[in-house]
Structure formats: structure tokens, C-alpha cells
Design a protein with these regions (language model features):
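C-terminal motif of bacterial Sec signal peptides marking the signal peptidase cleavage site
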Residues: 13-16
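Short edge beta-strands and adjacent turn/loop segments
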Residues: 41-67
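Positively charged n-region of N-terminal signal peptides that target proteins for export
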Residues: 1-4
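A short amphipathic beta-strand at an alpha->beta junction
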Residues: 88-117
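Short, non-transmembrane amphipathic alpha-helical segments
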Residues: 30, 71-97
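Short, low-complexity, Pro/Ser/Thr/Gly-rich segments in the mature regions of secreted, periplasmic
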Residues: 117-130
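Post-signal peptide N-terminal segment of mature Sec-exported envelope proteins
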Residues: 26-46
Length: 130
């Protein structure tokens, strides 16, 4: 009887350790946001939070632009989508999620004009698998 109980306990612990990719992503996004956001990642860029939409398998990155970067014309001229696609292609930390075909969405807000969205794009498998 003792062996059966120990075996059942071991099996339940193994089952509890198995986490779906969606649950893992949701957990990691939440932990990152709670531990590291907001944070300056460059002189003119602050990461505010991350989010995850399980239905669309989309990881959302929310940023605020400050100073000289806080300008819609500057953002438009810099072609951020192209740079973000390259960043996703090169990001080894995203490999598991890229292999599963996840999407990566980026939203940049203005610091000086609250509520003004300066740029938004979603990078999907068609973009980063090229």
C-alpha cells in the first residue's frame, strides 16, 4: 500500500510539472512584467509591460518613447517594423515560441502625449521565417 501511495504521489508530481507552452508563456510574461517593468532599455525607450493572448498566441510588448524618439515623424522614418522583424529572427530567447508559430506584437506610446500611439505592428511566422 505504501508503494502505491508513493507511486501515485510521484505521478501526480510529474503531471503537475508538465506545463503547456501557452501556460508557460503566460507565466513568463507575467513574471517578467512583475519583476522588471517598467524599465529603461535605452535612453529614449522604456518597456512598460508584456501581455499574452492565448487565443491568438500573441506576445504583446508595450513601450513608451521619450525625448527625441517621442515623435511620430521620427518613428515613421525609422522603419521600426523592419528592425523588429530582424530582432525577432535573431532572438534565441524566443526560439521555442517561434517554433510554435507564435506572434509578437509591439506597441509604442508617447510619453509627452498620453494616449497617443506612435507605432504598432505584429510580427508573425510569415515575417520571421523568411
Amino acid at each position: 500500500m505504501k508503494k502505491i501511495i508513493l507511486s501515485l504521489a510521484a505521478l501526480s508530481m510529474l503531471a503537475a510539472c508538465h506545463e503547456s507552452l501557452e501556460d508557460r508563456c503566460a507565466r513568463e510574461v507575467k513574471e517578467y512584467t512583475e519583476k522588471k517593468c517598467p524599465a529603461m532599455i535605452a535612453e529614449t525607450v522604456r518597456i512598460d509591460s508584456l501581455g499574452f493572448d492565448k487565443d491568438t498566441h500573441t506576445v504583446h510588448y508595450y513601450y513608451t518613447l521619450l525625448g527625441k524618439a517621442d515623435n511620430a515623424q521620427v518613428v515613421a522614418k525609422s522603419n521600426p517594423r523592419k528592425a523588429l522583424i530582424q530582432e525577432v529572427k535573431n532572438a534565441t530567447s524566443m526560439e521555442t515560441f517561434k517554433e510554435a508559430g507564435y506572434n509578437f506584437s509591439y506597441t509604442y506610446w508617447s510619453e509627452s502625449h498620453k494616449g497617443l500611439k506612435l507605432f504598432e505592428t505584429t510580427i508573425n511566422k510569415k515575417d520571421y521565417a523568411k
